[in-house]
């Protein structure tokens, strides 16, 4: 852990059965942070042992949803400046150097938060491909002004939201260097994640009272395949990108079918209850 920076940084990572990837994530942040917090949702593999061996502070917490888990991990950080990465991500050496330079030169408070470019790394790749897709995410921020806990009406859309009284115009900076986001370890892992994540998303949609049209249900998978493969540029991964785009599109389709299933069950319960009351009144 880096003890030389005047303004300390806490890193936090949430995990569940990430024994094959958590070391890479921790090693990419431990040299630029004062502490690394790992909140583990009851892994059954060696995730906890690996994290502890690398010097991380591990806390076991039953699953609260993506937003709840990250909010809890954030609350454990002792420093105002916090850095969040997922277990399947890694800060490049260049990004580590950039962050360290900003904090060592006492320039971090010019902004309230920093965005990171997350380059998608296919599971079979050793280095980023040219024109690889990427996402821009706020991952380094001062938690006095922003937090994952500000996310409402969702347990899955985990993003850093500024406090309502904070004027953040011009106060977010996109870092020059990138981090790497590694895709699933296997087709099986991607499908398992798609099933789990679509369950969580469907629950959110039910809570939000979302309605579903037959048109959207029948076109959802086609649209999201097009978006993943062409707009998000998964075509740079060739056949593997084609396969992953189908799985991604299927996950989006699944969340709607599960929303529909939940809606039908609710209607059946209401109809059954109405029928029972009618029989009682006779």
From Swiss-Prot:
Source organism, top-level taxon: Bacteria
Q: Does the keyword Glycosyltransferase apply?
A: yes
Q: Which SUPFAM superfamilies match?
A: Nucleotide-diphospho-sugar transferases
From the UniProt record, which GO molecular function terms apply? glycosyltransferase activity
Arranged from A to Z, the UniProt key words for this protein are: Glycosyltransferase, Transferase
E.C. number(s) listed in UniProt: 2.4.-.-
A Pfam family name for this chain?
Answer: Glycos_transf_2
* SS bonds (residue pairs): none
EC main group: transferase
Coiled coil regions, renumbered to chain: none
The protein's matches in InterPro entries, at most eight in alphabetical order, are given as: Glyco_trans_2-like, Nucleotide-diphossugar_trans
UniProt keyword Transmembrane, yes or no? no
Which family is it part of?
Belongs to the glycosyltransferase 2 family. WaaE/KdtX subfamily.
What is the name attached to this protein's record?
Answer: Uncharacterized glycosyltransferase RC0292
